[in-house]
Regions:
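Phosphate-ester processing/binding pockets and catalytic centers
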Residues: 1-247
C-alpha cells in the first residue's frame, strides 16, 4: 500500500477578476505538493523526524512547520537553517517520492476557462498531483497493478476552511471517478482523508516539500529544493513536468 501526504504553500486565491490581476500582497504562485511512501516506511519516517526534533531541543510534539520562525523555536538563524536542511534530508532518502504542482495563478485565472476561483485552482492542482503519483505507481508495478493508494491532507480548523475541505473532497472523488485523458485513478481510495498536521509527521514533511518548491518559484531560492532533489519524481532523467509540473 502507498500513502500520499499532501500540503500546500502560497494561497490559491488572491485574484481580482474585475481588474484581471493579482491582489496586492498575494503570492504569484500556488504550490500543492505530495510525499508518497510505502506503508511499511511509516514508523521509520516518524522516528527519523522525532530524532531531528530532539537534536534541536524540540519536543516531539512540536509541529515541524516550514514557515515557523527561528525565534519561535528558540534557535539561531544558522541552527534553524541546519534544522530545515536535516528535515529535507529525511525526505531525500525516498527516491521518486515527491511531486509538486506549481500554479502560476494570474496565468491560470486569465487563460483557463475551467479555473474561476480558488476551489477550481485547488481542484485542478489536485488532479495533476494524483495523475503523477498514479503514473509513478504504474512505473513501479505496471499498468495492471491493484496496489491501493490512500491520500491524506491537513485538516482545516475553522468553518470557512471546512467548506474548502468539503469542496476538496468532492474534487478528489470526481478526479478518482474521471481521471485524466491519459489515465484513470482506480487505485486511489474512495475518500480523501483529513488529519491534523500537528499529529502527523508525514504531513509535516509534505509541508516542507511544498515550502521548498514554493521558495524556488516565488523567491528564486533553490537552497532547500536542491536538498530535496533526490526525492523528486523523475522519469527518463527528467523532473520538469514529471516531478514538478508548472502550470
Amino acid at each position: 500500500m502507498y500513502i500520499v501526504f499532501i500540503d500546500e504553500s502560497g494561497q490559491p486565491g488572491g485574484y481580482d477578476e474585475e481588474k484581471q490581476e493579482l491582489i496586492k500582497g498575494a503570492t504569484k504562485y500556488f504550490v500543492l505538493s505530495g510525499f508518497m511512501i510505502e506503508g511499511n516506511d511509516l514508523i521509520d519516517i516518524e522516528r527519523k523526524l522525532n530524532q531531528v526534533k530532539i537534536k534541536y531541543n524540540l519536543s516531539i510534539e512540536t509541529e515541524a512547520k516550514w514557515n515557523s520562525s527561528y525565534n519561535s523555536l528558540g534557535m539561531t538563524l544558522d541552527e534553524y537553517k541546519r534544522y530545515k536542511s536535516e528535515v529535507c534530508k529525511i525526505i531525500a532518502e525516498y527516491q521518486n517520492s515527491v511531486v509538486g504542482i506549481v500554479m502560476d495563478k494570474e496565468k491560470c485565472y486569465k487563460e483557463r476557462k475551467n479555473i474561476n476561483d480558488y476551489n477550481d485552482l485547488y481542484a485542478y492542482s489536485l488532479n495533476l498531483l494524483m495523475e503523477r503519483f498514479c503514473m509513478e505507481v504504474t512505473d513501479r508495478h505496471g499498468r495492471d497493478t491493484n496496489i491501493p493508494i490512500i491520500l491524506f491532507t491537513d485538516s482545516r480548523k475553522n468553518d470557512n476552511n471546512n467548506r474548502l475541505d468539503k469542496e476538496l473532497q468532492k474534487s478528489y472523488r470526481r478526479a478518482k471517478q474521471i481521471g485524466t485523458k491519459y489515465m484513470g485513478f482506480p487505485n486511489f481510495s474512495e475518500s480523501l482523508v483529513f488529519i491534523d498536521s500537528q499529529y502527523s509527521s508525514e504531513v509535516q514533511l509534505a509541508d516542507f516539500c511544498a515550502g521548498a518548491i514554493f521558495k524556488k518559484f516565488e523567491d528564486n531560492n533553490e537552497e532547500f529544493l536542491n536538498i530535496l532533489k533526490p526525492a523528486i519524481r523523475m522519469h527518463n532523467e527528467k523532473i520538469e513536468g514529471v516531478g514538478i509540473k508548472e502550470f
